[in-house]
Amino acid sequence: PFAPVREMLGHYSEPFGLADARIAHQTRVVERANWKLVWENNRECYHCVAAHPELRRSFPASSSGSLPTDEELRFSEKAEQLGLPSAFTRSDDFQFRATRLQLVNGAQSMTMDGRPAVRGERLGRMPEENVGDVLFYHYPSTWQHWLGDHALTFRTLPLSP
């Protein structure tokens, strides 16, 4: 079932060498609520800005897919020159999609201070340059952030009807 995802997005994940990555931390959160409401809240367009204000230190407040700014275009062009795919891509049914986003405020990683979470090590063949965040979604239940120094994976799973 993952072949279409791998075929379309493998060029995004390959430079990160995720198959060789180690799990540094794992958390399980059980929300005692109607899972449909939890899901809808999570996918709400303004969820991150309202629920996670600390993300605004490094993550763009709006990644709506609107026309990129000149700075964003330069960032994408530089990433492509480094052999790192940047263009927004998606499946025909929008089940999965990926894009590379430029981090804000000079951040190099999605951490509280914007500095790399893992110092002195890069994932796969990531260069020392700021490679931004590859944001990968597989709807409806999985989203991931791949950064130069670490990757984050989130999965939602209803436990009851």
How should these model regions be labeled?
Residues 2-161:
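C-terminal catalytic domain of Rieske-type non-heme iron oxygenases
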